[in-house]
């Protein structure tokens, strides 16, 4: 079978059916009121010809044969696209349908239809913990994280995390006055792709992320030291093939 027309149906926040559409490089995008995802990103995620084995044999017959092979249906490519839609983390569900253009199978063309609904735009998480150390210090800690999904319409997420802890040393001696605390704030911007000069347009067969992070921490250890730390980092996680995965910070 060969892959024919490709279309995406993006449901509204309350499950509304699309009421408008647009065409981007042969990809028909149906949406409710306004596109919640940038057309160029949908095209990158669903570009069927972009997901193919690197070891695919290309003969000297040239481009015509290569293009012909790329238009063929492939379970490998279908799996890669489904993984990509799941990994961006902005869809509540996404369903891929392959519809025969001719039910009598006279035609060998399958039209691809993707039906998807976006997840909630915000996530919040609250964690509590209690620490007990060998130096008799004990105390509670908490962390609160708020995440905004699909920040720029391309699957990006931005989060802010606040964390704090307080510990005191148990005992009857004066050491029981040795109380410690820690306060921190961090923010991260996560892209579901590699963001790097000359590599920003490249799509790997497997999910990849780029994380930009800034943080600041205030730490007080009674009768020992006080420490104010702040900084940032960039982390690249990518998987060029199924048997290897890389993380660079």
PLM region spans:
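Gram-negative/organellar outer-membrane beta-barrel architecture
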Residues: 35-38, 57, 66-249
């Amino acid at each position: 079978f060969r892959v024919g027309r490709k279309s995406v149906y993006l449901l509204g926040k309350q499950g509304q059916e699309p009421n408008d559409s647009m065409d981007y490089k042969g990809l028909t995008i149906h949406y409710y009121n306004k596109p919640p995802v940038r057309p160029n990103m949908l095209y990158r995620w669903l570009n069927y010809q972009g997901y193919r084995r690197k070891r695919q044999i290309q003969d000297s017959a040239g481009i015509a044969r290569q293009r012909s092979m790329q238009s063929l249906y492939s379970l490998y490519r279908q799996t890669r696209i489904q993984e990509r839609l799941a990994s961006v983390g902005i869809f509540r569900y996404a369903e891929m349908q392959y519809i025969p253009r001719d039910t009598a199978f006279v035609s060998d063309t399958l039209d691809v239809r993707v039906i998807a609904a976006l997840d909630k735009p915000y996530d919040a998480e609250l964690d509590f913990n209690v620490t007990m150390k060998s130096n008799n210090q004990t105390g509670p800690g908490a962390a609160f994280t708020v995440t905004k999904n699909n920040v720029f319409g391309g699957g990006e997420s931005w989060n802010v995390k606040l964390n704090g802890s307080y510990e005191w040393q148990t005992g009857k001696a004066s050491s029981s006055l040795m109380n410690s605390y820690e306060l921190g704030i961090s923010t991260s911007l996560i892209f579901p792709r590699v963001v790097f000069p000359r590599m920003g347009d490249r799509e790997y067969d497997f999910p990849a992320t780029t994380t930009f992070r800034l943080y600041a921490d205030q730490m007080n250890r009674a009768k020992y030291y006080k420490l104010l730390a702040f900084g940032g980092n960039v982390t690249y996680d990518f998987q060029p093939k199924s048997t290897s995965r890389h993380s660079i910070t």
